[in-house]
């Protein structure tokens, strides 16, 4: 048999407090932009999604709490090999082989007596550009967003009045006609104390939509 306390709890209309089974903050629905919505990964956080798309979640500098990138052994070894393969200035001074001098650099050979340049050896060694100079890359998603923004910025959206606003304007017009000064001083209908010019602009637009002359 259950205790008196348990029976009272079962009869009570107040639900007991239960633990959240799912973190609702992770279920972010992106409705404002179709491109971001199409490329959104629901298994990642907002910060991780923005970083993956090449965007920033905050325009200002982060105050802390950033997720640290954990490098794998393969990435660490690749970095070490890359740093070891870099040509130092001291190495260039000791060689006369163009294949050992990076492209875009040169070695100047001077005369020991006059210190004049007698020979210039231009480097021919190809050097791969550092792709890690910037964390944010101009991905295809960013290109799509730029095209979308450029396309939609040229569209001029006309503001439409709500049903409640239409009823309010209709009441003003039926009561005062085109007398906007009386509309302005109407304390019951013009609760927001809008000016005669503002009321004229709204009524004119409302009359145009409803084909009233």
Swiss-Prot record:
**Where are stretches of biased composition, namely Basic residues?**
1-23
Pfam families found in the cross-reference section: Nop16 (PF09420)
* Region span, Disordered: 1-25
A single GO CC term for this protein reads:
preribosome, large subunit precursor
One GO BP annotation here? ribosomal large subunit biogenesis
The signal sequence is: none
User: What biological function has been recorded for the protein in this entry?
Assistant: Involved in the biogenesis of the 60S ribosomal subunit.
Which family is it part of?
Belongs to the NOP16 family.
- Name under which the protein is recorded: Nucleolar protein 16
**Could you tell me the gene encoding this protein?**
NOP16
């Amino acid at each position: 048999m259950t205790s008196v306390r348990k029976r009272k709890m079962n009869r009570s209309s107040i639900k007991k407090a239960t633990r959240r089974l799912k973190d609702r903050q992770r279920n972010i629905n992106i409705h404002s932009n179709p491109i971001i919505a199409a490329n959104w990964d629901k298994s990642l956080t907002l910060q991780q999604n923005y970083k993956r798309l090449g965007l920033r979640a905050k325009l200002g500098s982060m105050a802390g709490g950033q997720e640290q990138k954990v490098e794998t052994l393969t990435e660490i070894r690749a970095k070490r090999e890359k740093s070891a393969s870099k040509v130092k200035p001291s190495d260039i001074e000791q060689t006369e082989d163009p294949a050992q001098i990076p492209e875009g650099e040169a070695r100047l050979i001077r005369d020991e007596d006059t210190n004049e340049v007698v020979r210039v050896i231009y480097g021919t060694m190809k050097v791969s550009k550092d792709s890690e100079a910037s964390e944010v890359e101009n991905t295809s998603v960013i290109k799509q967003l730029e095209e979308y923004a450029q396309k939609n910025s040229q569209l001029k959206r006309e503001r439409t009045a709500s049903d409640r606003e239409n009823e309010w304007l209709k009441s003003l017009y039926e009561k005062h006609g085109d007398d906007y000064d009386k509309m302005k001083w109407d304390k019951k209908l013009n609760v927001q104390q809008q000016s005669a010019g503002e009321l004229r602009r709204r009524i004119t637009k409302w009359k145009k939509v409803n084909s009233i002359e």
